[in-house]
Structure formats: structure tokens, C-alpha cells
């Protein structure tokens, strides 16, 4: 699969803005997140790959996730985007939450179709990350794309989150020693 080049402005801090090409997968302690938590019985159970300012996942929607006219619900597509975009700052040793996100829907997705969601950091200023994302279908058509601002966790929040989700404090999300 070809990586996206992340159309739009270039990152100001020299970070890459393309999507992962088979990055690092990190297994967290079970948790209840609807998108990536293994403990949520009705969740999506996404596995996130991380690489240099980017995050990605591949996922197949089953019929539980359809909306009108037997297409994957737009809210589920938004969740895919939100998840990979929020994970993209992880290579900067940051956990992030959505502050603002704008989505453009370009095409519909069918249940049973393999979807690839990718998010990448385009700009970083202190704890604020500008991130772009896209969901593509099995045929590489763009189904949805988004841009947003994400707020990184404070230093004390990072320590608590790493402990809660089973990541050693001295290790970043990509497995490199923290600075």
C-alpha cells in the first residue's frame, strides 16, 4: 500500500506528514475505549500502528456499524478518523485529545469492505498538534478526510496515562527512550 503524502502545508517542525508504512504496534493493557479498547464488548477493537508523527489502522465494519441505506455510519467513519488523528502525536511522546475536528465525507463505505484510516501531524506548537487524516476504501478511493487540532497531555498526565495503560514511564509510544 502506498503511503499518503498528506496534502496541505508542510510541517513547521520538520516532522514527516506521511502515513505509516507498517509502523510499530503497541499492545495496551485492556481498557474500555470504544475505538481501541479490547475490553469493550461492542467496540471497534482497532489496532493502531505508529510511525514518525503518524498513526494508522485497518478495519472491516460488520453490519452492527451501518446506518442509512446499509452503508457504514458516518459517525463510525468519524471515530476512525478521530482515533488515528489522536494517536498521531504519540511519536512525540504525547497523548492527545481532540480539541477541534472538521470532516469531509467524499464517498460511502460498505460493511465488509477493508478500510484504512491514517492520521499525520502537520504542525506542532507546544502541546497543540495540527493533524490531518483520511479513510480510504479497499480500492484506494478517499471515503472521508479530516483536519483538526489536538491537545497533548501535560507531563503529569503522561506519567499517569503510561502507568494506567501499561507503558513503562521511560519508553515513548514508539518504543524509544523518553527525552
Language model features with spans:
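Catalytic strand-loop segment that frames the active site of acyl-thioester-processing enzymes
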Residues: 31, 35-72
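Short beta-strand micro-motifs enriched in acidic
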Residues: 49-51, 120-124
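HotDog/MaoC-like acyl-thioester-processing domains
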Residues: 1-24, 110-111, 122-179
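Residue-level recognition of well-ordered beta-strand positions that form the cores
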Residues: 58-60, 102-104, 118-120, 134, ...
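Short Pro/Gly-enriched beta-strand edge/turn motifs at strand-loop
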Residues: 26-33, 114-116
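Hydrophobic beta-strand-centered segment that forms part of the acyl-chain substrate-binding groove
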Residues: 6, 83-116, 121
Amino acid at each position: 500500500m502506498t503511503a499518503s503524502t498528506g496534502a496541505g502545508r508542510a510541517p513547521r517542525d520538520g516532522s514527516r506528514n506521511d502515513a505509516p508504512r507498517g509502523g510499530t504496534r503497541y499492545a495496551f493493557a485492556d481498557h474500555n475505549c470504544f475505538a481501541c479498547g479490547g475490553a469493550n464488548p461492542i467496540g471497534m477493537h482497532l489496532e493502531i500502528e505508529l510511525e514518525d508523527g503518524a498513526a494508522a489502522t485497518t478495519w472491516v465494519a460488520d453490519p452492527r456499524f451501518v446506518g442509512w441505506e446499509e452503508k457504514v455510519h458516518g459517525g463510525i467513519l468519524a471515530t476512525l478518523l478521530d482515533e488515528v488523528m489522536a494517536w498521531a502525536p504519540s511519536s512525540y511522546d504525547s497523548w492527545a485529545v481532540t480539541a477541534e475536528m472538521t470532516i469531509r465525507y467524499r464517498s460511502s463505505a460498505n460493511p465488509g469492505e477493508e478500510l484504512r484510516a491514517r492520521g499525520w501531524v502537520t504542525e506542532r506548537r507546544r502541546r497543540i498538534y495540527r493533524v490531518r487524516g483520511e479513510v480510504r476504501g479497499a480500492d484506494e478511493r478517499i471515503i472521508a478526510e479530516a483536519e483538526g487540532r489536538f491537545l497533548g497531555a501535560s507531563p503529569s498526565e503522561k506519567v499517569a496515562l503510561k502507568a494506567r495503560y501499561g507503558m513503562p514511564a521511560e519508553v515513548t509510544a514508539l518504543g524509544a527512550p523518553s527525552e
